[in-house]
From Swiss-Prot:
A GO CC term attached to the entry: GET complex
InterPro entries, per database record: Get1, Get1_fungi, Helix_hairpin_bin_sf
Name recorded for this polypeptide: Protein GET1
Role noted for this protein: Required for the post-translational delivery of tail-anchored (TA) proteins to the endoplasmic reticulum. Acts as a membrane receptor for soluble GET3, which recognizes and selectively binds the transmembrane domain of TA proteins in the cytosol.
Region of interest called Disordered, as start-end residue ranges on this chain: 189-210
Organism of origin: Coccidioides posadasii (strain C735)
Coiled-coil annotated spans: 39-95
Family annotation (PANTHER family): GUIDED ENTRY OF TAIL-ANCHORED PROTEINS FACTOR 1 (PTHR42650:SF1), TAIL-ANCHORED PROTEIN INSERTION RECEPTOR WRB (PTHR42650)
Keywords per UniProt: Coiled coil, Endoplasmic reticulum, Membrane, Transmembrane, Transmembrane helix, Transport
Length: 210
């Protein structure tokens, strides 16, 4: 089983990645992946997309048909359009309910696997030291702070270790972002080909020099 030290670090890394990427972006990606699976919701989504295409096609046909010169054809297209539109709205409403339930489940899992798990570990292991400090290495006042609130004196508590992990992960993420921006700005740029005006101007300049 991984040590408590590693578990807390992983929780903060995952939390930072979620906050950096964006919870809504992750939810949308998971929803798209969920629709790729063979389930009832994916079938509803396929049917909804099919009905949407059919509604758009019927709308184009109605616009291309004169309601005065070809009234019978236009009326038939209108009835098909209205019926298909009702089916589309029903499927769209059902799909919206599925997505709301899916988003709630994803948010619940994300909360309990990050913030909820972190709070539980801090409560359950509040008296458990993450690691011990060498005796006499630092003043006892600092030892008391590092063991706050309930870990034995001379050790590092899970609360303090969690704060250290959050700070280090955030600084590391910012440093990676700065390096990425620096490397991107230093990337070699392709030279733009000379325009015809520039090419024609060069021979003229040479002739003048001669």
């Amino acid at each position: 089983m991984p040590s408590l030290l590693i578990i807390v670090l992983i929780i903060h890394v995952v939390t930072y990645l979620i906050n950096t990427i964006g919870a809504n972006t992750i939810d949308s990606l998971l929803w798209l992946l969920y629709l790729k699976l063979p389930n009832q919701t994916s079938q509803t989504a396929d049917e909804q997309r099919r009905l949407k295409r059919e509604v758009m096609q019927l709308k184009r046909e109605m616009n291309a048909t004169s309601s005065q010169d070809e009234f019978a054809k236009w009326a038939k297209l209108r009835r098909r359009h209205d019926k298909t539109m009702e089916e589309y709205e029903a499927k769209n409403k059902a799909l919206g309910k599925h997505k709301s339930s899916f988003d709630l489940a994803v948010k619940s899992v994300r909360f309990f696997s990050t913030t909820g798990l972190k709070l539980f570990l801090q409560f359950w292991f509040s008296k458990t030291p993450i690691f011990e400090l060498p005796r006499g290495w630092i003043p006892w006042q600092v030892e008391w702070v590092l063991s706050f609130p309930r870990a034995p004196l001379g050790t590092v508590s899970i609360q303090i270790w969690g704060g250290v992990c959050a700070t280090v992960v955030s600084l590391a993420g910012d440093a990676i972002g700065v390096v990425n921006v620096y490397l991107t700005s230093k990337a070699p740029k392709q030279k733009e080909p000379a325009t015809s005006g520039e090419n024609s101007a060069r021979p003229m300049a040479i002739k003048k020099e001669l």
